[in-house]
């Protein structure tokens, strides 16, 4: 069974995403992944770059094109681009058959297995999250 991963990004995060995906595969050598790539501006060249720099035998990329109009009125800051909002609407963006997905920032490095995190008991909640503290 493939683990479902969600990433949200713009073209400025393609290279960091290749690092994240390679570290994910390296730290989870016994797993295959379906990676949902939610974006509104990636090009074919961006996806081609990913396919050339990430082993595709264990990593299926799924292109989730988000309409530009979906977040046209959302507040955008330098540290809060519109792509940040996509994860909040994962249930609307992902295929209905996806019943569990793990969101990972495209600029992190995975250093351990994510099995335990992926199988976390939500205790009846629709989602679980970790806090992010600055400073």
Which sequence ranges carry the predicted segments?
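Glycosyltransferase catalytic domains, chiefly GT-A lineage
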Residues: 1-135
């Amino acid at each position: 069974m493939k683990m479902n991963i969600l990433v949200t990004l713009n073209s400025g995060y393609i290279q960091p995403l290749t690092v994240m995906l390679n570290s994910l595969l390296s730290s989870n050598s016994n797993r295959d992944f379906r990676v949902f790539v939610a974006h509104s501006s990636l090009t074919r060249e961006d996806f081609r770059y990913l396919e050339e720099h990430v082993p595709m035998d264990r990593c299926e990329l799924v292109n989730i094109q988000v309409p530009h109009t979906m977040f046209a009125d959302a507040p955008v800051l330098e540290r809060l681009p519109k792509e940040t909002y996509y994860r909040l609407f994962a249930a609307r963006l992902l295929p209905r058959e996806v019943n569990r997905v793990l969101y990972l920032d495209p600029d992190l490095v995975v250093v351990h297995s994510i099995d335990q995190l992926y199988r976390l008991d939500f205790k009846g909640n629709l989602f679980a999250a970790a806090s992010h503290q600055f400073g």
